Regions:
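Bacterial Sec-dependent N-terminal signal peptides
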Residues: 1-39, 46, 263-265
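Short glycine/proline- and aromatic-enriched beta-strand/turn motifs that initiate or cap beta-hairpins
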Residues: 34-83, 262-266
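Short loop/turn motifs that connect adjacent beta-strands in outer-membrane beta-barrel proteins
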Residues: 34-39, 80-92, 146-157, 215-219, ...
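Predominantly the C-terminal beta-signal and adjacent terminal strand-loop region
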Residues: 38, 54-56, 207-266
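Residue-level detector of the transmembrane beta-barrel scaffold of outer-membrane proteins
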Residues: 42-44, 93-95, 160-162, 220-222, ...
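Residues on the lipid-exposed face of transmembrane beta-strands in outer-membrane beta-barrel proteins
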Residues: 45-49, 73-79, 138-142, 163-167, ...
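Transmembrane beta-strands of outer-membrane beta-barrel pores
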Residues: 47-53, 98-104, 144, 165-171, ...
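Extracellular/periplasm-exposed beta-strand and loop segments of Gram-negative cell-envelope proteins
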Residues: 56-66, 103-135, 169-202, 234-256
């Protein structure tokens, strides 16, 4: 119990830092817009599959990672300064984004893919989980080439790397066809004190790689792969004691592969 309290306090501190960073960036953005008139804006949408690495399934099992999946959909807004910050404008973009993610989860791997009919195996097979996540965050993108080339007749292919910080509101649900989670009949001993249906807020950090492809003047497609590390291990509804179960070595994290469309205007 003391361990979970310490982890919760640590998560809350990290969440406050994430919120503070987002507010500072938003404040700087609004101040810059008020001071300078020469900037252009972009709006876009994105969607794609997301794969959640959680406490469901055997650690390191590829099937577990690929099948505990869902989808993500969202919108984003870019602000790029054109005239007043030439060094920044040629290499960086600043993106505000909001998204919705839904993932369904089960246990996969060697502990359920066997002929055993033990209580532990049956309990694992009967467990299911679902989590939905609403995310708001910021992302800074670095372009090796000029970010506005595709609007000036330059290369239509513009790759980038990015880093970001987000605030996530999640709702997790853990169920079993054997009965109520938390009872000995339905719950493996590993999850007796480490499974719950709950709602919460957690910060996250992300790293992305992607590219823009111009399809017409002021129109582009975006292809992006993002890894997102949550500052909580409760996003999936499971969090076995990592002092006892050494395989629980990290918080929940996800990989998303998205396709988006962006429209540019002054």
């Amino acid at each position: 119990m003391f361990l979970y309290i310490c982890q919760d306090l640590k998560s809350k501190i990290m969440l406050k830092k994430a919120i503070l960073f987002i507010l500072i960036v938003l404040g700087c953005s609004n101040s810059s817009q008020a001071q300078y008139e020469q900037f252009y804006k972009e709006f876009g949408i994105m969607a794609g599959p997301v794969f959640l690495k959680s406490d469901f399934g055997a650690r390191g099992d590829f099937e577990n990672f690929t099948k505990n999946s869902g989808f993500t959909v969202g919108g984003f807004y870019y602000l790029t300064f054109v005239e007043n910050f030439p060094n920044i404008r040629e290499k960086f973009k600043f993106r505000l984004e909001a998204s919705y993610t839904s993932v369904n989860m089960k246990h996969y791997g060697k502990y359920v893919d066997n002929t055993s009919n033990s209580l532990f195996t049956r309990q694992l097979r009967a467990m299911e989980g679902k989590t939905t996540i609403g995310t708001f965050g910021v992302q800074v993108e670095f372009f090796p080439w000029r970010v506005d080339d595709y609007n000036r007749g330059g290369s239509p292919f513009t790759p980038y790397i990015a880093g970001g910080v987000q605030v996530n509101s999640y709702s997790s649900e853990v169920t079993s066809s054997l009965g109520k989670i938390g009872t000995p009949e339905a719950t493996p001993a590993k999850y007796m004190s480490g499974a719950k249906t709950d709602q919460g807020v957690a910060g996250s950090l992300s790293a992305s790689i992607g590219t823009r492809i111009k399809i017409a003047d002021y129109h582009a497609l975006i292809f992006e792969m993002r890894g997102q590390y949550y500052l909580s291990d409760w996003v999936d509804g499971l969090n076995p004691n990592n002092k006892v179960y050494k395989e629980n070595k990290s918080n929940d994290w996800s990989t998303a592969i998205t396709v988006g469309y962006v429209y540019y205007f002054n």
